[in-house]
From Swiss-Prot:
HAMAP family, per the entry: Ribosomal_uL3_B
Function: One of the primary rRNA binding proteins, it binds directly near the 3'-end of the 23S rRNA, where it nucleates assembly of the 50S subunit.
Protein known as: Large ribosomal subunit protein uL3
Gene Ontology MF, one: structural constituent of ribosome
CC per GO annotation: cytosolic large ribosomal subunit
Record PANTHER family: 50S RIBOSOMAL PROTEIN L3, LARGE RIBOSOMAL SUBUNIT PROTEIN UL3C
GO biological process, one term: translation
Family per record: Belongs to the universal ribosomal protein uL3 family.
Superkingdom of origin organism: Bacteria
Length: 209
């Protein structure tokens, strides 16, 4: 059964294995989350649960959202995200989902918003090659040709300099190294998208089964 949880990125560190190898890991504050809504094939065309995560002042929640939380009989949450599930009957509105749904060694997919880098050139943004850097060359880090003379215009979708980052990114098949249910911490091997404190969606791996 697909499973998932919302979390907040704490930061990166490293842990050592028994044979002395250092493993870079990311610490995530995962959950506890609350099921705010259930979506079924009969009513919505697909099975999913809506999870709430994070504290927020009630004064910062607008009236439509207050009504949404009141119908579920749960306190207001900062984040609401949907996660597709197969067995919708296994969940109930108001049910709490904790980090212990994952086990050590399990593979997960982590989704987040990548760090914003601001305006970047073609080399940094798309991996273009440089031109000659010696004296006499007038072409160093410029994009180069943008198309043929015939159309006399630049086609939509051409790779150009522009804003880099701040995009939804999913990293697949990351290994769960440690689970700490008491402190709601999930330790995952490798890096995950986003800055410290940003929202993450951790789901069971699609390709790592």
């Amino acid at each position: 059964m697909p499973k998932g949880i919302l979390g907040r990125k704490v930061g990166m560190t490293q842990i050592f294995t028994e044979d002395g190898r250092a493993i870079p890991v990311t610490v995530i504050e995962a959950g506890p989350c609350v099921v705010v809504q259930k979506k079924t094939i009969a009513n919505d065309g697909y099975n999913a649960i809506q999870l709430g995560f994070g504290e927020i002042k009630e004064s910062k929640v607008n009236k439509p959202l207050k009504g949404h939380f009141n119908r579920a009989n749960v306190k207001p949450m900062r984040y609401l995200r949907e996660i597709r599930v197969e067995n919708i009957d296994a969940y109930e509105v108001g049910q709490e989902i904790k980090v212990d749904i994952f086990t050590v060694g399990e593979k997960v997919d982590v989704t987040g918003i990548s760090k914003g880098k601001g305006f970047a050139g073609g080399i940094k943004r798309h991996g273009f090659h440089r031109g000659p850097m010696a004296h006499g060359s007038k072409y160093h880090r410029r994009p180069g040709s943008l198309g043929a003379k015939g159309p006399a215009r630049v086609f939509l979708g051409r790779k150009l300099p522009g804003r880099l980052g701040m995009e939804r990114v999913t990293i697949q098949n990351l290994e769960v190294v440690k689970v700490d249910p008491e402190r709601n911490l999930l330790v995952i091997k490798g890096s995950v998208p986003g800055i410290r404190g940003s929202l993450l969606i951790i789901k069971e791996a699609v390709k790592g089964k």
